[in-house]
Amino acid sequence: MFYCRSGFEKECAGEIQDKATQLEVFGFPRLKNNTGYVLFECYQEGDADRLIREIKFNELIFARQMFAVAAEVSDLPKDDRISPILDALSDVDGVPCCGDIRIETPDTNEAKELLKFCRKFTVPMRQALRGKKMLTERDSNRIPVLHICFIAPGHCYVGYSYTNNNSQFFMGIPRLKFPADAPSRSTLKLEEAFHVFIPKEEWDDRLASGMWGVDLGACPGGWTYQLVKRSMFVHAIDNGMMAQSLMDTGQVKHHMVDGFKFEPPRKNVTWLICDMVEKPARVAHLMGEWLIKGWAKEALFNLKLPMKGRYDEVLQDIENLKDFLKKNGFQYKLQAKHLYHDREEITVHIQAISNISPH
């Protein structure tokens, strides 16, 4: 089972089908539009476990979470929902003892009405699972996570994910609060990207105070805000106006020029960030040019998606960018994700493995 943004089930299914085919795992996706999840039916027993081990979760763009389904339980009686779930799990071989439990729903307005129930249900369900030795007495992040996903009041899927190959977040969504002093809600996109792409233990080194960043298409400053908040200095590139609160910090230099024409005055930029409303292929190529010229060490940018053929567009743009970087002898690590705060766009992160530019 794969969670995704409501309305992006086809993209998620297409991606999973491609990954499964590459692994020679045969099956087919089952989906309904606007449900916020995709099920992939494997033809062979044991292949669901193989998929969640061998598909690299951090290489999936449209999936927020994945777990192997052990059982589907429907028509749960209101007076005892626990026993049928325990019985269903007891009937299945190969379900590992888990170290944590997440009782979730897909991210749709309809399903979210069940979240209050999920919270109340978690404690008694946890105790019952511990009583049956299906869950460890103490929470452990070293062994699998048990997922119970309710898609309707009496209907759930029960399964497990591996902690070294899943999303660490409940429902696959980081819980972030909008900062009252941020100039726009877009600030949450960049904050979420930091949580998803950069391990927390590396934040002090890679998001360090005193670094320089460049924000292409910066106005009014939602993304610049995240760098300023971390005591960085920023070249903000936009013909529009920046929020005065950011300019007053003394950490921002505003350049009223075209983002495609700006060149940093000194080659001391660590972070290149970009949320321009432009054709995705054009933005991706611009990011590649900055990196191979050695103008930035890490790039984080959004690619706006077309109305149709969204998955194909994403694949093409990322493949073209990878080819461009390789041809120029640039070594890199690339991740892309359709983040919770993204809508008709995906966020891409590239880190230079070697900061020595061939140019």
UniProtKB/Swiss-Prot annotation:
One of its GO terms (biological process) is methylation. It catalyses: cytidine(2498) in 23S rRNA + S-adenosyl-L-methionine = 2'-O-methylcytidine(2498) in 23S rRNA + S-adenosyl-L-homocysteine + H(+). Signal peptide: none annotated. The active site is at K304 (proton acceptor). The keyword Methyltransferase applies. Its EC number is 2.1.1.186. GO terms for molecular function: S-adenosylmethionine-dependent methyltransferase activity. Keywords: Cytoplasm, Methyltransferase, rRNA processing, S-adenosyl-L-methionine, Transferase. One of its GO terms (cellular component) is cytoplasm. It comes from the Bacteria. S-adenosyl-L-methionine binds at S186, C219, P220, G221, G222, D238, D258, D275. It is found in: Cytoplasm. Catalyzes the 2'-O-methylation at nucleotide C2498 in 23S rRNA. Belongs to the class I-like SAM-binding methyltransferase superfamily. RNA methyltransferase RlmE family. RlmM subfamily. Monomer. This is Ribosomal RNA large subunit methyltransferase M.
